[in-house]
Amino acid sequence: MRTLAGVEDEDKWLAEGIAGIQHNAFFMHRALDANNLREVLKYSALMLSELRTSKLSPQKYYDLYMRAFDQLRQLEIFFKDESRHGLPVVDLYELVQHAGNILPRMYLLCTVGSVYIKSKQAPSKDVLKDLVEMCRGVQHPIRGLFLRSYLAQVSRDKLPEIGSDYEGDANTVMDAVEFVLQNFTEMNKLWVRIQHQGPGTVREKQEKERNELRDLVGKNLHVLGQIEGVDLEMYKETVLPRVLEQVVNCKDKLAQYYLMECIIQVFPDEYHLQTLETLLAACTQLMPTVDTKIVLTQLMDRLSNYAASSPDVLHEFLQVEAFAKLSNAIGKVIDTQLEMPIVGAMTLFVSLLTFTLRVHPDRLDYVDQVLGACVVKLSSVPKLEDARAMKQVVALLSAPLEKYSDIVTALTLSNYPRVMDHLDDGTNKVMAMLIIQSIMKTDSCISTADKVEVLFELIKGLIKDLDETNAEELDEEDFQEEQNSVARLIHMLDNEEPEEMLKIICVVRRHLMTGGPRRLPFTVPPLVFSAVRLVRQLESQGGDIAGEDSATPRKIFQILNQTIEVLTSVPCPELALRLYLQCAEAASDCDLEPVAYEFFTQAFMLYEEEIADSKAQVTAIHLIVGTLQRINVFGVENRDTLTHKATGYSARLLKKPDQCRAVYACSHLFWVDDPDGIKDGERVLLCLRRALRIANAAQQMASATRGSSGPVTLFVEILNKYIYFFEKGNPHITPSDIQSLIELINNEMQSDNGNTTIHSDPFFTSTLRYIKFIKQKGGLMGEKYDPIKL
């Protein structure tokens, strides 16, 4: 039993051991030079006796062992040369067995045994069997481990495998396998026994030291994996059962985990696939404290890579029913290991799903089965709070999205939304964003109402308002990014069949209406434009389609009216007004005058009742005027009503400059530059004159309040309108009108500057330059400008 001591004591004992080896090695080398066999055996035995110490930790003992190992290599060279020691190798093999102590005797016997096998004077299997049996005489765990490690090392190149020099009638591959298996079994027993050395108070230190020695045991499995001639049949019938028997029976957490890891890594993937049932059965028999999920994950990764290596091997997976066996094994492990945390179970499901997607991507039923098993496990937990487990669930849900380029495939998985239901609000949003990003990345088009229903159920975390407390904590930038993503998603929903597209719009609308006041301003506009696009599609196909359930422009406009009306209660009147005007223009294109008039009515009501901000009013009136100017569906009465309203509101804006610009913008309502457009030159002139009066009043107010009339920009803008309508052929706009306005602007500029410098306004200068250019250009237009004097 190794006594407990400090690091300083161990260093001292190690130094003493090394000194002893060096001292005896010196005399051994002197005897080697003299070819004195008796002295060589004497001092080599004394040198190897230093390895009998029990005072050193495994790491220190390894340092001592390596010093002795270097000397043993020199000794082996001496034993090979019979001319130097004068004894046949058979006699030498007998002679070294007379060494006084068993540990030096066994090291010498292994060294001579290596030479004996190489001489081929006896079948290698007999010598190997003799050595592996006699090594049982050393039962101290650390000393025995290093002795058997030495035996494995000196015999590695002397195994009777196929193609080796030692293969023959008396020697077979099975003999080599039997030797390695027997040595492995004994080494594993010694390794496991180390934990029982010393008091239990230093168990953690002992486990660490045992972990450092694991490679000595694992090398045997590595050798087994490299022996030429171990075919699938031998592996299935002999190698794997013997190894797994030792793994299961040792009942040691560290040994079971490490040896299962070795088995998976050192043997071929094809062998794993053909012996999958046996391997998985062993996994379910491991100690509950063994981290089985890592073992199974490594196995599935190996098999997945094997499947990806060549399409020709995929039929093998179907033949052995790999998915069913893995699924059953994982279910048993999760059910039996009651202490396994939820993150462990989720990790196993992620690995199984990854395996399924790589090996059986076409079997959606397998994918759904994995998700279903995940739902069952999650349902057994009151609430999923483990962040690591949540991360694994996200990985589970992300895997189908990454595998299938078409998101529609994932939407057919019935258990997918059931898994998402177990996520918390924050993670649910993260997953919903991943789904939307996947759709954008693959440019997928969701084309049926049923699939849209499933999709919006999946992303409901982004669509519905959170609790008030959570809503306040939400970062505004993140919130906007989420809602913009939903808006982009709505544009990806499309179907060439109008009836199905209308169903999609209704499904989306039903979900979006639950969004609350913060979300609607982001999500309603894309829905409106999607519906307007459908209206224009119907119009291009010939208008209304018969049938009560058919998609018709009138029906769609009714839905749009109800949808936009919700925005007014948010409140978000400016956005609602813009959308009403868009719908009015679409109704005009469909030649639906009453519908277009109703949308304009709603827009004017919003302007009157909801929009109070002066800047918003200016923007709104220009939008109304611009839209009304483009619409040609109205009859005389309706158009007069709407234009009268627009010009009236324009003249009642708060600021005089805003009034002026809105009024001269209204002039375009009476002159539409289309063959069939209205051309009322008289009313155009009235608007421009009214704008001129307002501009004049603005100049006077500026002069009264600031002492100067200020810039003449408004007059120049009105001048440009005169020039526009003059060139368009309005008979009521004459050269004299333009001439008078130019003179007015010059006078205003002179009075403001107090001198005779004119044309200091760049806009006015550019306007005059344009008139001059047209005059010089000549032609009909040039002649029209001739009366104007600059």
From Swiss-Prot:
Family according to the record: Belongs to the VPS35 family.
InterPro entries listed in its UniProt record: ARM-type_fold, Vps35, Vps35_C
Name of protein: Vacuolar protein sorting-associated protein 35B
Gene this chain is encoded by: VPS35B
One term under GO cellular component: endosome membrane
General function of this protein: Plays a role in vesicular protein sorting. Component of the membrane-associated retromer complex which is essential in endosome-to-Golgi retrograde transport. Also involved in the efficient sorting of seed storage proteins globulin 12S and albumin 2S. The VPS29-VPS26-VPS35 subcomplex may be involved in recycling of specific cargos from endosome to the plasma membrane.
Record has Disulfide bond as a keyword: no
Gene3D superfamilies on file: Vacuolar protein sorting-associated protein 35, helical subcomplex Vps35-C
Subcellular location: Cytoplasm; Endosome membrane; Prevacuolar compartment membrane; Golgi apparatus, trans-Golgi network membrane
PANTHER family, per the entry: VACUOLAR PROTEIN SORTING-ASSOCIATED PROTEIN 35B, VACUOLAR SORTING PROTEIN 35
Keywords, comma-separated and alphabetical: Cytoplasm, Endosome, Golgi apparatus, Membrane, Protein transport, Transport
SUPFAM superfamilies membership: ARM repeat
Known tissue expression: Expressed in siliques and maturing seeds (at protein level).
Membrane topology: Peripheral membrane protein
GO BP terms in the entry: protein transport; retrograde transport, endosome to Golgi
UniProt entry tagged with the keyword Membrane: yes
